[in-house]
Amino acid sequence: MRRYEPIERSAAAIAVAVAAVALVAAVAVTVRGHDKVWAHAATTTSGDPQRGQAMFIQYGCGSCHHLTYVRKATGEVGPPLDGIAVRAVIAGKLSNTPDNLQRWIRDPQGVTPGTGMPDLQVGERDARDISAFLYTRSG
């Protein structure tokens, strides 16, 4: 069995420490980036993205729409919602603005009569929060 010299053990310990620091830094940057995205979505929509995620689930949006990393969002009837925050158009014809997204969520039949998206009687606050959550989904 090979015996390691103290200098080799020290070098290995330093390498492990550097790798650990790099990992912590990467996680911190990711968390900070996540927080910025969520804060921007909240500011843009005047909604609460965290509550919006709960409302997305409560209204059963995932039964029709797929959204990665959201439990019960495995639907295939409606369009997938990953990347909705960076789409130019929503509902097939509306500019992707917070007001338009909230209008679409609240009254899809009023926007496009006969659309497959049902009117779920989503209130103003819930629509604002759901739109805030969806605007966290840039890809």
Regions found by a protein language model. Give the residues of each.
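Short cysteine clusters
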Residues: 61-64
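Flexible gly/pro/ser-rich segments immediately N-terminal to CXXCH heme-c attachment motifs
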Residues: 55-58, 119-121
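Hydrophobic membrane-insertion alpha-helices, especially the h-region
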Residues: 12-28
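Cys/His-rich metal-chelating microdomains
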Residues: 67-70
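Short, Lys/Arg-rich N-terminal segment immediately upstream of the first membrane anchor
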Residues: 1-9
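Extracytoplasmic electron-transfer domains, predominantly the class I c-type cytochrome c fold
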Residues: 72-139
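Electrostatic cytochrome c docking/interface patches
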Residues: 32-57
